[in-house]
Amino acid sequence: MDIFNNNKFYEGYEGETEVIFQILGDNNTSIHLWNGYIDDIMNHQPGTEDDFKNGLSRDWNTLEGPYSDENNNVIDIDDYYNDLLRFAGVKFKYEETKEVYDLVMYFLKQAKENNQEVEVIVD
């Protein structure tokens, strides 16, 4: 999977909300995503409200972390990865969302294996 300045899942959505996962201090190792794909993932959350207290689910639902106005963009990779594991096997609205999900999981796994920090920017 290509994680070198990958814009594939934002092309055609310029001007709409963009979510960028990037290695802290390395703008070239990044994936740029249309927020609609993230919304699609989050709109298919399995479980109960108690399951929304971690990772991307928490930040998306409560407008914390990258979704806040405070620019708190460095994420806990394990927190995000483990939260997103709950979505494995979910059928999403958009066909491309599964590819986005797989790409985000791959990106987080690679960052963890390489002891890198990840920041998420919602713009």
Regions found by a protein language model. Name each.
Residues 1-106, 110-114, 123:
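Acidic (Asp/Glu-rich) sequence patches and key acidic residues
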